């Protein structure tokens, strides 16, 4: 049975990752995590600039890291992470208690 991944489901899993796991927020730290090989999953918001999006997709494909295109703006991605600022990209380093890596 395939579980349907909804936006609310992703947001609750992101909140659990932020509480129990490790994640980096922001473009520079996401690129650094991809280059180091510590990133397991990368989230990119809808309104991320095209140049940055293509660069992250390029490095993630070289490192064979999964990418999830978040359905929402950078404000919504930051809010889903429990932060009060905008976040266009994020990388999950350790999922913690969340099963977000299994649903991708």
From Swiss-Prot:
One family name in Pfam for this protein: Ribosomal_L7Ae
GO MF entry, a single one: RNA binding
UniProt-listed InterPro entries: Ribosomal_eL30-like, Ribosomal_eL30-like_sf, Ribosomal_eL30_CS, Ribosomal_eL8/eL30/eS12/Gad45
GO CC terms, sorted: ribonucleoprotein complex; ribosome
Keywords on record: Ribonucleoprotein, Ribosomal protein
PANTHER family the record matches: RIBOSOMAL PROTEIN L30 (PTHR11449)
Family assignment from sequence similarity: Belongs to the eukaryotic ribosomal protein eL30 family.
Name by which UniProt lists this protein: Large ribosomal subunit protein eL30
Organism: Tetrahymena thermophila (strain SB210)
């Amino acid at each position: 049975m395939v579980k349907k991944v909804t936006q609310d489901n992703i947001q609750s899993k992101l909140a659990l990752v932020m509480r129990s796991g490790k994640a980096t927020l922001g473009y520079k730290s996401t690129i650094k995590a991809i280059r180091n090989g510590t990133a397991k999953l990368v989230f990119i918001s809808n309104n991320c600039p095209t140049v940055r999006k293509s660069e992250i997709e390029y490095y993630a494909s070289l490192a064979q890291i999964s990418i999830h295109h978040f359905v929402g703006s950078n404000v919504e991605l930051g809010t889903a992470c429990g932060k009060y600022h905008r976040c266009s990209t994020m990388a999950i380093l350790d999922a913690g208690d969340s099963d977000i890596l299994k649903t991708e």
